[in-house]
């Protein structure tokens, strides 16, 4: 029963990350269409950058500690990418350079959204299969 709750927790954290990535994508398109200024965009999005990375890291840690190696290994590339962004200090949005970076950040957000969607369906399948097994 513990593994089912681990997958359920990972499922909910991934759901939160999907919502955050959709919010990021909408905000980037608002900046492109000039509905929001760069200072407001940076202020709004920087508030959610570290929680998004934290949710993903906590989910991966739960999977590691529960012994779900395959699903943990599925998370390792995104963990490494997030760690690289934090170490190179490119994870936060800078209002002075956001116009230059908006298309690459939007592509990054789409990629993360796709990855989190895959994680969501994997966790959903594993959660349901663990419940059926018990």
UniProtKB/Swiss-Prot annotation:
Localization annotation: Endoplasmic reticulum membrane
InterPro entries tied to this protein: Cornichon, Cornichon_conserved
The keyword Cytoplasm is annotated on this UniProt entry: no
Keywords: Endoplasmic reticulum, Membrane, Transmembrane, Transmembrane helix
GO biological process terms, semicolon-separated: endoplasmic reticulum to Golgi vesicle-mediated transport; intracellular protein transport
GO molecular function: signaling receptor binding
Membrane topology label: Multi-pass membrane protein
Disulfide-bonded cysteines: none
Cellular component, GO annotation: COPII-coated ER to Golgi transport vesicle; endoplasmic reticulum; endoplasmic reticulum membrane
Pfam families recorded: Cornichon
Membrane-spanning ranges: 8-28, 54-74, 113-133
Similarity field: Belongs to the cornichon family.
Name used for this protein in its record: Uncharacterized protein C2C4.05
Organism of provenance: Schizosaccharomyces pombe (strain 972 / ATCC 24843)
């Amino acid at each position: 029963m513990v593994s089912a709750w681990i997958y359920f927790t990972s499922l909910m954290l991934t759901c939160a990350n999907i919502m955050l990535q959709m919010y990021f994508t909408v905000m980037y398109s608002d900046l492109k269409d000039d509905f929001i200024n760069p200072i407001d965009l940076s202020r709004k999005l920087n508030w959610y950058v570290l929680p998004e990375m934290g949710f993903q890291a906590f989910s991966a840690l739960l999977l590691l500690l529960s012994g779900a190696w395959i699903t943990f290994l599925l998370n390792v590339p995104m963990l490494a990418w997030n760690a690289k962004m934090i170490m190179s200090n490119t994870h936060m949005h800078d209002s002075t350079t956001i116009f230059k970076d908006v298309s690459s950040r939007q592509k990054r957000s789409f990629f993360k959204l796709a990855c989190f969607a895959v994680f969501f369906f994997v966790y959903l399948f594993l959660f349901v299969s663990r419940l059926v097994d018990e």
